[in-house]
Amino acid sequence: MGMNNIKVRTKLVIVMVIALIALALCAVISNTSLSGLGNNALDIIENDMRSSYDEQIKAQVDNVISLCQSIYNRYEKGEYTLDEAEKLAADQIRDLRYGNNGYFWVDTYDGTNVVLLGNDTEGTNRMDAVDTNGFAYMQAIINAGKQEDGGFTDYVFPREGETESSPKRAYSKAFEPFGWVLGTGNYTDDIDAVSYTHLTLPTKLEV
C-alpha cells in the first residue's frame, strides 16, 4: 500500500511538473505572439506615416512646379522677359506656406540659392553645405531633384534654437526651363519615435 502511495505521489508530481512546463511554454508562446503582433502593428503605422509624409511633400513641390510652369507659359507668350518670369516665380514661392511651418527653397543647378525665406542665404552658393554629420546634403538634394521624378534626401540638423541634431527628410524636383531645383521638407522625429517604440516593444512585453 505504501509503495502504491509513493507511485501515486510520484505520478502526481510528474503531472504537476509537466503542467507547469506546459503553462510556461504557453506563456512564452503567448508573449512572443503579442510581441510579434505589436511589432507588426507598429510596422504598419510607421510605413503609413512615412508614405503619407512623402506623398505630402512631393505633392507640395509638384504644386510649386505647376506654378512655375504657368508663369513660364506666360513668358513664352511674350508677357514677360525670362528674368521677369523668374523673379515673379521666386517672389511667389518665397511667400508660400503649407501646414504649420512648411516652406519651399529654390537653388540653381550649380548650387546658388534663389529662394530661402528671404534670408541672407539667397544669392549665395551652398553646393558644399554639409549637415551635422558632414553629409553634403545640398549636393544630394540637387542631384535627387534632377532625377526624372525628383527624389528624397535624408539628413540631420538642429532645430532653430537647439543644439542637438534632429532628422530631416526633403523632396526636391527640377524645373528645367529655369534651371532650378525646388524643394521642401521637415523634421521627422515623430516617425522615428514609432521606430524607437518598435525596437523597445519586445522588451516591454516580456517584463
Task: Cite the ranges covered by each PLM segment.
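Juxtamembrane membrane-water interface segments immediately C-terminal to a transmembrane helix
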Residues: 31-65, 76, 83
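Short N-terminal helix-loop-first-beta-strand/juxtamembrane motif that initiates sensory/input modules
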Residues: 94-113, 150-151
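Extreme N-terminal signal-anchor transmembrane helix of membrane signaling/transducer proteins, especially
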Residues: 6-37
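Extracytoplasmic
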Residues: 116, 136-194
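N-terminal sensory and localization modules of signal-transduction and trafficking proteins
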Residues: 2, 37-38, 72, 79, ...
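Extracytoplasmic/periplasmic sensor domains and loops in membrane signaling proteins
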Residues: 79, 83-91, 120-160
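Conserved small/polar residues in nucleotide/adenosyl-binding loops
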Residues: 197-203
